[in-house]
């Protein structure tokens, strides 16, 4: 064994880290480095106030590579984590490493997870994808991303770090390298400082990023009758400042903060109708159209503005010959969709994706299906930003309170499981009490659970863990048929991979949607038009 070589490597690693990081109190006198590239200067200056130092000769050596142990130490220092000099991480290859206390600190904080085989590889140079992973976990950046982002760099497509890098790009933390993103590229000292400083400087920003994958219109207020603020916007990544339970989001535009709906309003016109360029019968007739389902982009009294192949046109609903009104029980019915956790509560940690974003994305997809296909109103108990309530216990009460306040007809809570990495499968719960003092809809809840469970098993092709009785607050305290479904285990490789996929989450949403329709069929209503 070449012990001299090993000692030399360890010494070099410790030296690099100590040169990169030093206690803030040693930086009383401001230093400047002559070799820092312009693009990294602001970041270097920023971290010098926290924990950054240079070489003994007064240089910074920006092109020097940084290893994983040094990166862990830098993250621990910038995050202000408590360092126990005696602490050991769980990784076998890092227990006796010079950076062991720092690796233990960032592991405890949930910033790192190792390579999946029980090792951390602390002396290995860190690549850009791994650096992105540290930043996303350390600053909970996934909580600032709504839905799925497009991959803008060709060299990221199919790479395990694509989703992580996409988040950094969308949040303005990274712009790539000029000729790609280079996820396997080794991080230099300058790049490490740039990554960390840019992320830390933006930590007070609570806005979200979302890719709007269709043309969209903005409005003055969260209402189609509030007035259109501009022509259609092309599909793009948008900055979201607020999201409401009814599907409206406040976004940043070049003319200030405006509103747009997550889902376009669809309305079925049952008779022949005439369209106009303005909301006035005195304006020119543009055309006559056969009965069809239209997209409504604006409302003004009895008039609605719709999208046609020839552009936006107005029609007067008062002129329509309405079909004989049927007794449609769906009108006015509200379905409460409850995506579990949220905000600071990420739920179970997943191999690929944590519970909270999985269930929120699935819930939004369910809501969209109801908005597009039925007269139902589907409301979410939380937005993408936070969980309701002051703490976990209060959050449960707020969810039930929301359901009651909005006169929910049924309540469906969506979760994902986690245990030890080996457990897998799908299960759905309902509440059954020895007395009827709590939720009295035991039989309805059971049938609803059975219908949703059956659809999910078929759609997700997961192990059927069954329909179970659960003494869960949101089921017990509700005053409507209520169920809680666990889609799968995010910490299981097979289940987690499915739940990480937008396509599989769409399958889950469609299964929940169909299961709810099945429930209403069981209740004696003809739902065939809505499947």
Curated annotation (Swiss-Prot):
Localization in the cell: Secreted, Cell wall, S-layer
Keywords annotated in UniProt: Cell wall, Hydrolase, Plasmid, Repeat, S-layer, Secreted, Signal
Domain MurNAc-LAA, first and last residues per copy: 335-517
All residue ranges annotated as the SLH domain in the record: 29-85, 86-149, 150-210
Enzyme class: hydrolase
This protein's GO CC annotations: extracellular region; outer membrane-bounded periplasmic space; S-layer
GO molecular function terms attached to this record: N-acetylmuramoyl-L-alanine amidase activity
EC number: 3.5.1.-
SUPFAM superfamilies per the UniProt record, alphabetical: Zn-dependent exopeptidases
Keyword Signal applies: yes
Signal sequence coordinates: 1-28
Top-level division of the source organism's lineage: Bacteria
Record annotation: effect of changing residue 27 to S: In strain: Pasteur
GO biological process: peptidoglycan catabolic process
UniProt similarity note: In the C-terminal section; belongs to the N-acetylmuramoyl-L-alanine amidase 3 family.
Name of the protein described by the UniProt record: Uncharacterized cell wall amidase pXO2-42/BXB0045/GBAA_pXO2_0045
Organism annotation: Bacillus anthracis
Organism placement in taxonomy: Bacteria, Bacillati, Bacillota, Bacilli, Bacillales
